[in-house]
Swiss-Prot record:
Protein name in UniProt: Zinc finger protein 235
Role: May be involved in transcriptional regulation.
Any one GO BP annotation for this protein: regulation of DNA-templated transcription
UniProt entry keywords in alphabetical sequence: DNA-binding, Metal-binding, Nucleus, Repeat, Transcription, Transcription regulation, Zinc, Zinc-finger
Organismal lineage: Eukaryota, Metazoa, Chordata, Craniata, Vertebrata
Disulfide bridge partners, by residue number: none
Residues in KRAB domain copies: 8-86
Protein source organism: Mus musculus
Major subcellular site: nucleus
């Protein structure tokens, strides 16, 4: 066991909340705060005991009576407390009458010239106890209910008022002793004092004006900073005190509280190690790189590896390095297959407690993490952080090959396979390879025919979730994709990309046969059927075939008689949207097709094509009977009637 390395004052262990913070605490948290501060002050005495073999000699009862103290409580150091413990050997004599141990914190505690110019931030004086209080059983309710509430409120006020004297009388005469069973500053109560006097045959409390201090308990409370006796039941972490363990367990459970720990009196329980009650939220060690604070120097040293990149812990199986031994222990479970954390609902195992905690929310439906921008909720904090990049447009992961950036590291890994050509996912049915697991899973449904995504509106099923989401916009009318040039909106990104070529004139997809350009790959594929003569889309009614699905759909309306496109001016209906657009020019008088030779204008492109033959002399329609040629099909049909008469 190691000795104390430095003096400890109450300022070092006290924690003070502002008035605003105190207002946020409920009754239970205020009581907890009171208990924490009280326990901290009690254990300040324990800090002063050095080590057991250096304690002052004990009397036959094992109890040392403490004399009058001279310092205010906030100035008490371990040295001062130790001096009080050895008082009889130092020649300090406590009279049989009047006040004793620290009778006044400093009865005229004005902040004068001999005092600090400013009150300490961490005040810890106790409020005056009722002067009429005695040790009788009639006063069992002392420090309970409203009295305790007002006492704790005054006890932990935000800061000292320099115009007030210190309200504390730590321990007064026997007529003003603490309530039975209440231990302050490590002193036993008057009630316990009586018991000890009777048990050990020492003068009764009526003959003794001193508050006695059990030095055996003081010895138990000595601080051994390197001792670690509290181990987490869910992992291998070990802590030097129970508050730190409790704080760690609350972190695992995702709990947060303004008061960081609870303190239970374990002085009389031999099975639980006695540890100091220094508040676990105290941070004494600070990182010079980023300013982050830590309660232990070892935690700071571990954190600094984030900045240095040091990874001293290596996996024997794969050679991967880690900055913390706990991370290495968790990683080893990847190789061993160990999954110590089991879901009680479905039995699924996990390598980490945090993963189990996140999984359990699937069963409970809990989503505690809420996006402040859009209100969307998530079951995992990591999912929330990832989602927030949608709003911030942050893309921290950059491809070294092409410079493209991604919001997720997983998406970057998948993208890099475009450059490497890696396709680790192989289909056993057809041998096709895929760069991502999601693409592979979607492909497998081609063979199985599975369509797990069902539209509740029209009943249509889809094999891919992306296709299902795109389809739903038909019913909702949602158009999330907006053209920045003209403001037109589209339900699908593909439609927006096709539209943007109207403004840019860009047609990146070229036909290898005729050189014609297209703005979209699907348009080029449809055009290829012109050269190949392929017509893969067949009408089930008349068996007519078409090169495009849109042409087949328009044709099928011939059989159904459906005419969904209606003219708002005259009410005439059409089976095709293009036919409606041409018809509307009759009402508007629009003639968009103009002859470059003579300037004549036409409503339809077919009219312009027929007219241009007047200038070119082209006569594509030839009579097989007499060989006469015609520039228009209508003239050709009229001529054929001459031969049939």
């Amino acid at each position: 066991m190691t000795k104390l390395q430095e003096m400890v004052t109450f300022r070092d262990v006290a924690v003070v909340f502002s008035e605003e913070e105190l207002g946020l605490l409920d009754a239970a948290q205020r009581k907890l705060y009171h208990d924490v501060m009280l326990e901290n002050f009690r254990n300040l005495l324990a800090v002063g005991c050095q080590s057991p073999n250096k304690m002052a000699p004990l009397d036959t009862t094992g109890i040392r009576c403490l004399p009058l103290g001279q310092l205010p409580c906030w100035q008490m150091t371990s040295h001062d407390v130790n001096k009080l413990a050895r008082a009889p050997e130092d020649g300090i004599n406590t009279p049989g009458k009047g006040p004793h141990l620290l009778e006044q914190c400093h009865s005229s505690c004005h902040w004068g010239a001999e005092q600090p110019s400013q009150a300490p931030e961490d005040d810890g004086c106790l409020e005056n106890l009722p002067s009429n209080h005695s040790s009788s059983s009639d006063n069992q309710e002392f420090l309970s209910g409203r009295a305790q509430s007002s006492w704790s409120k005054a006890h932990f006020s935000e800061r000292w008022n320099h115009e007030k004297h210190c309200p504390q009388t730590l321990v007064k005469t026997k007529s003003q002793l603490l309530a039975p069973g209440v231990n302050i500053l490590g002193c036993i109560s008057h009630h316990d004092h009586n018991i000890l006097h009777k048990r050990d045959k020492v003068p009764s409390s009526g003959d003794c004006d001193q508050v006695i201090f059990p030095m055996t308990l003081l010895t138990q409370h000595c601080v051994y900073r390197e001792q670690k006796a509290y181990q987490c039941s869910r992992g291998q972490e070990v802590f030097s005190d129970s508050p730190s363990l409790e704080l760690h367990q609350q972190t695992l459970l995702g709990k947060k509280s303004p008061v960081h720990s609870t303190h239970k009196d374990t002085r009389h329980s031999p099975s639980v190690p006695i540890q100091p009650s220094v508040h676990p939220g105290r941070k004494r060690y600070w990182c010079h790189e980023c300013g982050k604070g830590f309660r232990q120097s070892s935690a700071l040293q571990t954190h600094q590896r984030v900045h240095t990149g040091e990874k001293p812990y290596r996996c024997d199986s794969c050679g991967k390095g880690f900055s913390r031994s706990s991370d290495l222990n968790i990683h080893r479970r990847v190789h061993t297959g160990e999954k110590p954390y089991k879901c009680e609902v479905c039995g699924k195992g996990f390598t980490q407690w945090a993963h189990l905690q996140a999984h359990e929310r699937i069963h409970t439906g809990e989503k505690p993490y809420k996006c402040g921008d859009c209100g969307k909720r998530f079951s995992c904090s990591s999912n929330l952080h990832t989602h927030q990049r949608v709003h911030t447009e942050e893309k921290p992961y950059e491809c070294n090959e092409c410079g493209k950036r991604f919001s997720l590291s997983g998406n970057l890994d998948i993208h890099q396979r475009v450059h490497t050509g890696e396709k680790p996912y192989k289909c056993e049915e057809c041998g096709k390879g895929f760069s991502s697991a999601s693409s592979f899973q979607s492909h497998q449904r081609v063979h199985t025919g599975e369509k797990p995504f069902h539209c509740s509106v029209c009943g249509k099923n889809f094999s891919r979730s992306s296709h299902f989401l795109d389809h739903q916009r038909i019913h909702t009318g949602e158009k999330p994709y907006r053209c920045e040039v003209c403001g037109k909106r589209f339900p699908w990104s593909l439609s927006l990309h096709s539209h943007q070529s109207v403004h840019t004139g860009k047609k990146p997809y070229k036909c290898g046969e005729c050189g014609k350009g297209f703005s979209h790959a699907s348009s080029l594929q449809a055009h290829h059927s012109v050269h190949t003569g392929e017509k893969p889309f067949k009408c089930n009614v008349c068996q007519k075939q078409f090169s495009k699905t849109s042409n087949l759909q328009a044709h099928q309306r011939v059989h159904t008689g459906e005419k969904p496109y209606k003219c708002d001016t005259c009410g005439k209906a059409f089976s095709q949207k293009s036919s409606l657009q041409v018809h509307q020019r009759i009402h508007t008088g629009e003639k968009p097709f103009k002859c470059e030779e003579c300037g004549k204008e036409f409503r339809w492109s077919v009219g312009l094509s027929s007219h241009q033959r007047v200038h070119t002399g082209e006569k594509p329609y030839t009579c097989q009977q007499c060989g006469k040629g015609f520039s228009q099909a209508s003239y050709f049909h009229m001529h054929q009637r001459v031969h049939t008469i």
